[in-house]
């Protein structure tokens, strides 16, 4: 279904109306233990609980996550979302402000903010483009200044919290475009 022109509330309603799936390498995951901030920061949109509307894609993730001896498991989830941020449309001003607020205080993050200023200040830039620019800037700073990437985690965590505080409880984008697989809807909590 097309997301073009939908409000964050309309998008949430549409996504709430169908099941989503999460593929993992563990069979003992329970909803109460899911903490999006204890996940991999190197994922496309950083830390979060990634789901897809494609059971086939979730199965692939489950198999890859279980390679180290785990149990490939697919969990179905149903949402009760209120407002969803579409990462493929121009980032709303409150999202830009939430991200910018997280890039202050610590000199390497201030430097990263300067590096991405052209992108984040461009009103046509999508959340996806801004996030990619941040990841690239942090990667460059990490190498040039010999700062381990995990040193930036608190700031990425703060970005996610600030986006939540701006009123969004999930992010969505079209999966498969980067990997050449079939298009599918991804929702990140």
Predicted feature descriptions by range:
Residues 1-55, 59-189:
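Active-site and NAD+-binding cores of ADP-ribose-processing enzymes
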């Amino acid at each position: 279904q097309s997301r073009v022109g939908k409000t964050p509330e309309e998008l949430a309603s549409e996504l709430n109306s169908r099941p989503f799936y999460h593929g993992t390498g563990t069979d003992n995951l329970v909803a109460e233990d899911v903490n999006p901030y204890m996940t991999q920061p190197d994922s496309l949109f950083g830390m979060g609980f990634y789901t897809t509307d494609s059971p086939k894609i979730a199965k692939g993730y489950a198999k890859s996550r279980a390679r180290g001896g785990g149990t490939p498991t697919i969990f179905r989830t149903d949402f009760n979302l209120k407002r969803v941020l579409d990462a493929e449309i121009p980032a709303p001003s409150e999202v830009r402000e939430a991200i910018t607020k997280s890039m202050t205080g610590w000199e390497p993050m201030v430097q990263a903010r300067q590096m991405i200023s052209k992108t984040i200040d461009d009103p046509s830039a999508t959340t996806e483009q801004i996030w990619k620019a941040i990841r690239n800037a942090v990667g460059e700073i990490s190498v040039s200044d010999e700062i381990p990437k995990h040193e930036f985690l608190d700031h990425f965590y703060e970005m996610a919290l600030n986006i939540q505080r701006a009123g969004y409880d999930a992010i969505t984008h079209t999966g498969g475009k980067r990997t050449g697989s079939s298009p599918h809807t991804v929702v990140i909590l």
